[in-house]
Amino acid sequence: MKKLFIILVLFFGIFSFSTVHSQIATKDDVIFYTAEWTGERYPDGRPRVSDELLERIKKISIEEAWGVLRGAGYVNQFAGDWEMICEDKPFTGRALTAVYIPRSPGLDKRMLDKGHEEGMIGASNSWPIDMLNEGDVYVADCFGKVIDGTLIGDNLGNAIYTNSHRGVVFDGGARDLEGLGKIDGFNAFVRGFDPSYLTNVMLTGINVPIRIGTAVVLPGDVILAKREGVIFIPAHLAERVAITAEFIMLRDKFGHQRLKEGRYTPGQIDGRWTDDIKQDFLEWLDKNPDLLPMTREELDEFMKNRTW
């Protein structure tokens, strides 16, 4: 038992040391974190879920995504209780993660110096912003700090939107709410707004696994941010989440229509469908191809394994 304890201490000590001395995770690190993903990746190693899939996911509900993830065993993917600039501006994107901790002056100086030696410019809270691509969402763990934990104001907000055309998700604060609100298309999910400046925090990791509330976020996760909260979808599950949610929406639309028409009872629609109802649904799909957010081939393949 003592030997096992020593091994664990050494393992986590080495892991922590390597994370602190490598603020930006290497490509190999990111591939290790996201090994389930087999598709296209960015040069930094992050999974690159397609723009088309991001648009499809933007149309689904938090509950639908949550249900699919929970069914797949991913139970730590949702974070709620946000303040936001606009409640009616949902967004999706690919996570670029960052983690901040309370400042330790000596370590902070060494890490700033190291970052500057590696080509980073200015204060460390601007480094993740410089790395953003179109479609990225800057997701940061600032340990819930709002007062003196304002990761961005309107200047950095403009830089973020210029680079990514997406919003941000911060387990921390932001300032300049009025100015941020003038950035057309931008939204921020934060723990609060405060006029203070960012101080006494330090950046210790970029593109590493982070915690947001009770949720875990990996680099390249698909972010679905809506008024209800934010759900973090592992990249390798994004397509499953999309098509399952889309199927449920089609099923519900068909059910609502048939209930209004009086063709079936609520018990028939809410219970296990009979073969006659299933056939009616398939014929309804044939007559309403414009309602399908996926191809009919994708839907048919999905329904082969569906238990209804």
Region spans (language model):
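Bacterial N-terminal signal peptides
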Residues: 7-16
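Feature captures the catalytic cores and cofactor-binding loops of soluble hydro-lyases/lyases
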Residues: 56-219, 233-308
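N-terminal pre-domain segments of enzymes
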Residues: 23-66
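Buried hydrophobic positions in well-ordered alpha/beta secondary-structure cores of metabolic enzymes
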Residues: 45, 160, 221-223
